[in-house]
């Protein structure tokens, strides 16, 4: 009886040892050895371990699994293209735009400085000067090459033509007023004296017969006034003015501006335009100063539409992007390049308790098998 119990215990211990060691060795052989072991040209069986040996296949299968079951287009759609995500993105963008642009005290010049355009006011003024100079040169060229008739519209020409009789009437009225004035009388007297003195002895003889020139002033004055009041005078002057005006309209406008100094005019014009623009002052204001309703417009119109279109476009391109990313190959490369030592450490660290239980289970099963074998041997 004692021999039976000793034999039974001995076989149970041997079975437990074999079962435990076998399971422990099997677990180790999942990862070890990391490389194949050779004796001369003969490779030792079961080297390298299962996972190192099948790492390429494992990498390919993991890549396929990830692409076909884990990171599928539908997974991305559910995760990143849901209505909730879109609303969160929209809210985030609205907040950032409001904080960064519309409620920020930064001026337009500050934004230009950030973008690297710190000399923008001077650059704009130079551009303005160049534009004004170009337009000024264009105007001068137009005045030099085109006639007044071409430059003036038909309506303006008709208006100016109609002003000629009015101008003639005004000139005659002013001439009449002048010759009836004391100053006009003095002018007439001086003209008569100059005329008589220019005729020499003949003039002196006339002066002797007529007496002093003062006696002629009244007569000449009346005749001049009659001449100015006569309808024929107005008609004659109107005709002369009209003829001369028609001749002038066929000449370039620049013919009448030959003596004008254009450089000072250009400089003053450029200065005036720059003063009116006040570029530096205008750029020294925040965006909200010129666009107070911009925040609400961006929030209610631009951002929602932009986000919606961006999500629709991104969802349309999702499958194409995933194909271009080639996630299967990425996973395969990463798994294939991942050190086996790190993988072993990771798996054992996570499943250490389970592996111990497997080892214990092997020992228990080995012990039970040893007991059964002991019983069989005893009965035989």
UniProtKB/Swiss-Prot annotation:
Ribosomal protein is among the record's keywords: no
Pfam families per the UniProt record, alphabetical: DUF445 (PF04286)
PANTHER family assigned to the protein according to its UniProt record, in alphabetical order: UPF0754 MEMBRANE PROTEIN YHEB (PTHR35791:SF1)
Listed InterPro entries: DUF445, UCP032178
GO cellular component terms attached to this protein's record: plasma membrane
Location(s), subcellular: Cell membrane
Keywords carried by this UniProt record: Cell membrane, Membrane, Transmembrane, Transmembrane helix
Top-level division of the source organism's lineage: Bacteria
Protein name (record): UPF0754 membrane protein Bsph_0374
Membrane topology: Multi-pass membrane protein
Residue ranges crossing the lipid bilayer per the database entry: 1-21, 357-377
Family recorded in the similarity comment: Belongs to the UPF0754 family.
């Amino acid at each position: 009886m004692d021999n039976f119990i000793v034999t039974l215990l001995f076989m149970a211990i041997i079975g437990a040892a074999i079962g435990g060691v076998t399971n422990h060795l099997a677990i180790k052989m999942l990862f070890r050895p990391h490389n194949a072991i050779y004796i001369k040209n003969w490779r030792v069986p079961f080297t390298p371990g299962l996972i190192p040996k099948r790492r390429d296949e494992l990498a390919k299968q993991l890549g396929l699994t990830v692409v076909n079951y884990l990171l599928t287009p539908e997974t991305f759609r559910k995760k990143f293209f849901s209505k909730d995500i879109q609303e969160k993105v929209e809210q985030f963008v609205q907040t950032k735009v409001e904080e960064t642009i519309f409620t920020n005290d930064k001026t337009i010049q500050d934004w230009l400085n950030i973008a690297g355009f710190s000399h923008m006011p001077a650059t704009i003024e130079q551009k303005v000067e160049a534009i004004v100079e170009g337009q000024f040169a264009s105007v001068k060229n137009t005045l030099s090459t085109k006639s007044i008739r071409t430059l003036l519209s038909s309506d303006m020409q008709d208006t100016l033509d109609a002003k000629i009789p009015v101008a003639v009437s005004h000139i005659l009225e002013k001439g009449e007023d002048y010759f009836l004035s004391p100053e006009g009388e003095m002018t007439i007297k001086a003209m008569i004296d100059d005329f008589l003195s220019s005729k020499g002895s003949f003039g002196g003889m006339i002066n002797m017969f007529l007496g002093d020139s003062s006696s002629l002033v009244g007569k000449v004055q009346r005749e001049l006034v009659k001449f100015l009041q006569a309808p024929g005078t107005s008609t004659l002057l109107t005709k002369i003015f009209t003829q001369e005006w028609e001749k002038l309209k066929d000449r370039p406008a620049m013919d009448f501006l030959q003596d004008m100094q254009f450089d000072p005019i250009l400089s003053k014009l450029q200065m005036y335009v720059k003063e009116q623009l006040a570029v530096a002052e205008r750029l020294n204001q925040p965006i909200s100063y010129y666009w107070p309703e911009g925040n609400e417009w961006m929030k209610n119109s631009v951002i929602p539409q932009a986000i919606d279109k961006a999500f629709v476009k991104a969802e349309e391109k999702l499958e194409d992007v995933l194909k271009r990313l080639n996630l299967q190959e990425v996973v395969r490369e990463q798994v294939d390049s991942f050190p086996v030592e790190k993988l072993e450490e990771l798996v054992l660290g996570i499943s250490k308790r389970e592996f111990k239980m497997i080892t214990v289970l092997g020992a228990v099963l080995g012990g039970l098998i040893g007991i059964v074998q002991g019983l069989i041997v005893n009965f035989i």
